[in-house]
């Protein structure tokens, strides 16, 4: 952006110089030599007179250089018009007004770029803050998950212990019922045998 701004400044100075020269030429007081401050008059060496052909050649070279410079300035201005939002009436702009608008446009772009950098920096800081919060939440979630797994493990161990105690009690009850049931069966058999023997003995006595 800075090289473009410096180029615009150079073009602006050139356009101001050209317009000043054109106004001076229109009013008839254009001065080809720079203004000299009053001071002591120095003797000037007389230059030898030049031939008319040499003067014409120097003038033609100067005109050719001026023509090339104007053509280059025109090409730069055309490229500048393509890069600026001028609208439909861009043909009405003079060189000086076009360069001034270009300078204002560059300043506007620089301001936008600065605001964009500031916004980018704020967004980067916000992203870092959110990243830290996310890491903290992940740590809390991991701790909660480990606590839940530990609680589930303790619950499952408690249930296994209770189930083992219950199974042991049921086994003892089954054994006791089996023993008591066998003893009752033997007792009933013994009583039945006694009654049978008594019945046979009574018949013999009769």
From Swiss-Prot:
CDD domains: bHLHzip_Mad3. The keyword DNA-binding applies. SMART domains: HLH (SM00353). The gene is MXD3. Transcriptional repressor. Binds with MAX to form a sequence-specific DNA-binding protein complex which recognizes the core sequence 5'-CAC[GA]TG-3'. Antagonizes MYC transcriptional activity by competing for MAX and suppresses MYC dependent cell transformation. GO terms for molecular function: DNA-binding transcription factor activity, RNA polymerase II-specific; DNA-binding transcription repressor activity, RNA polymerase II-specific; protein dimerization activity; RNA polymerase II cis-regulatory region sequence-specific DNA binding. Residues 25-67, 146-171 are annotated as: Disordered. This is Max dimerization protein 3. SUPFAM superfamilies: HLH, helix-loop-helix DNA-binding domain. It is found in: Nucleus. Residues 8-25 are annotated as: Interaction with SIN3A and SIN3B. Gene3D superfamilies: Helix-loop-helix DNA-binding domain. One of its GO terms (biological process) is regulation of transcription by RNA polymerase II. Efficient DNA binding requires dimerization with another bHLH protein. Binds DNA as a heterodimer with MAX. Interacts with SIN3A AND SIN3B. Interacts with RNF17. GO terms for cellular component: chromatin; RNA polymerase II transcription regulator complex. It holds the Pfam family HLH. Keywords: DNA-binding, Nucleus, Repressor, Transcription, Transcription regulation. It comes from Homo sapiens (Human). It comes from the Eukaryota. Residues 57-109 form the bHLH domain.
């Amino acid at each position: 952006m800075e090289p473009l701004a410096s180029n615009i400044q150079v073009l602006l100075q050139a356009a101001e110089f050209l317009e000043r020269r054109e106004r001076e030429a229109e009013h008839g007081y254009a001065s080809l030599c720079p203004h000299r401050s009053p001071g002591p008059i120095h003797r000037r060496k007389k230059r030898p007179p030049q031939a008319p052909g040499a003067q014409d050649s120097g003038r033609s070279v100067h005109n050719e250089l001026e023509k090339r410079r104007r053509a280059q300035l025109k090409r730069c201005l055309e490229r500048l018009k393509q890069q600026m939002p001028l609208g439909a009436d861009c043909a009405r702009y003079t060189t000086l007004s076009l360069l001034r608008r270009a300078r204002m446009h560059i300043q506007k772009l620089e301001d936008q770029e600065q605001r964009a950098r500031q916004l980018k920096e704020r967004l980067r800081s916000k992203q870092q803050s959110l990243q830290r919060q996310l890491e903290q939440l992940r740590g809390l979630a991991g701790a909660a998950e480990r606590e839940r797994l530990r609680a589930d493990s303790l619950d499952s161990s408690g249930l296994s212990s209770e189930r083992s105690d219950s199974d042991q009690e049921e086994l003892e009850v089954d054994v006791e019922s089996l023993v008591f049931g066998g003893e009752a069966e033997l007792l009933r058999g013994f009583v039945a045998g006694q009654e049978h023997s008594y019945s046979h003995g009574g018949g013999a006595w009769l």
